[in-house]
């Protein structure tokens, strides 16, 4: 049996092969494979990734990697191994640590940026991309990552919140500006004046709540314009 390859059995008795590697006293699973050769190739690729920093790199400025689609090792595991090699910290999600932020690689062509304050959360929560939105499984529920910024479900970018630098992949706190934190409320511009569109007093809130909401919105808009 090749190095790093082990035989395993499914419940129905079918044979499959597991591959793993040990680096800096950390035992790392590389995945399960249908053939012994696939498992062996993956192990050899992992050895090369961990030993050849000149061949396998992550460009933190361009958010690119040297990963090739022809490689047998999954892209997610590729990022995990390079981060472990370069930063000495094993993280189970495809995260690469930088000085004041970290990169979360969803795919070879899609990378999100987060503050280091969010590292613990995203090291234990895997991000799922669906329909242009990003979610995590939190206590059995799919939760939008926008909720961590006080942005409600079904909020619209450009109306309810904006990315200050125009990069919708940059989720650092200082880059996100929440315009509207309220349900059923929107603001429109007409003849150079701001108009607040409030919920109906008879259906969505009481008259007193309606007045309080209007005052809060006016104060919030004033702060945004200062």
Question: What is the meaning of each model-derived region?
Answer:
Residues 1-226:
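Boundary-flanking segments of nucleic-acid-binding domains in nuclear regulatory proteins
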